[in-house]
Amino acid sequence: MTLQIGVIGCGAIGQDHIRRLTRKLSGARVVAVNDIDPQQARDAVTKYGLDAEIYGDGHEVVAAADVQAVLVTSWGPTHEAFVLDAIAHGKPVFCEKPLAVTAQGCMRIVEAEVAHGRRLVQVGFMRPYDEGYRALKHVIDSGGIGAPLMLHCAHRNQSVGERYTTDMAITDTLIHELDVLRWLLGEDYTSAQVVYPKKTRHASAHLADPQIVLLETASGVRIDVEIFVNCQYGYDIQCEVVGENGIAKLPDPPAVGLKHAARQSVEIMTDWKERFIASYDVELQAFIDGVRQGALTGPSAWDGYAAAVAADACVRAQQSGAVEPIAMAERPAFYRG
């Protein structure tokens, strides 16, 4: 069976996923597209040679008889309505982050999915599909370094545009760590604090950069995450887990070591898409396979809710300077195990 997918949103991310579905992945094809800009939808159909219907409204894509699953890559504030509509139609839906722009919106999706009685939602958190993170989780779960005590992490971008704001360091940048570190440790966060080091001269006037986010988990693990989005030298993701008996570190992407002119060096990536390109392929293939097999296993609506609650607390901590509690609703039995 070839899974017939409808895509809502044909911007950069939407077209990147259409490219994957058309040229890279197996078991699926795009049969319907929509974008708020009709020309962008037409361009996607032409560019990738799609045999797909172009719809004027995303909800028409969800309702289309030949659409068996939905891919939501539209503007963030529209995600919640499209995901809820897909659930109401009983159709599996892959939604790029954010699942919803508020924790309350995420909870409405959780409640709708629980009421439906079957998992239909996968959220576009790709880092759990990265080989390096998977290897790191294997070491943690095997007990090789003992119980984790501390994590030292960094999320560094070469530079960001003028529209990037201080809160986006949480909602656009840290959000990936909030998801993957919770997945690595298998436990929720209980508090967050944000502190501000000396500001880099490369940051715009309205942006606080760098920032350090301090998190605590339910078992007492302490996490520090450096967010530095104008580091200049490249795109660099670091994660070191300090355990009772040893330390495990996220491996850097493979790169050729160069010795030349009395220097030794390794090239550092500058593009976040390049760093995790394989993970994007794996996550979407996992969604396709999960739908075809009747069992989604990727990041769930509950994971989207958990990330949103933690992000809200971090934004409050940015503003207050205090240690802010992270209070989540009780996890439904539907999402356990």
UniProtKB/Swiss-Prot annotation:
Protein name: Inositol 2-dehydrogenase
Keyword annotations: NAD, Oxidoreductase
Entry EC no(s): 1.1.1.18
UniProt source species: Burkholderia ambifaria (strain MC40-6)
Gene3D superfamilies for this protein: Dihydrodipicolinate Reductase, domain 2, NAD(P)-binding Rossmann-like Domain
Reaction equation(s) it catalyzes: myo-inositol + NAD(+) = scyllo-inosose + NADH + H(+)
Subunit structure: Homotetramer.
GO BP term (any one): inositol catabolic process
Family according to the record: Belongs to the Gfo/Idh/MocA family.
Enzyme class: oxidoreductase
Molecular function via GO: inositol 2-dehydrogenase (NAD+) activity; nucleotide binding
Function: Involved in the oxidation of myo-inositol (MI) to 2-keto-myo-inositol (2KMI or 2-inosose).
InterPro entries attached to this UniProt entry: Gfo-Idh-MocA_inositol_DH, Gfo/Idh/MocA-like_OxRdtase_C, Gfo/Idh/MocA-like_OxRdtase_N, MI/DCI_dehydrogenase, NAD(P)-bd_dom_sf
Gene behind the chain: iolG
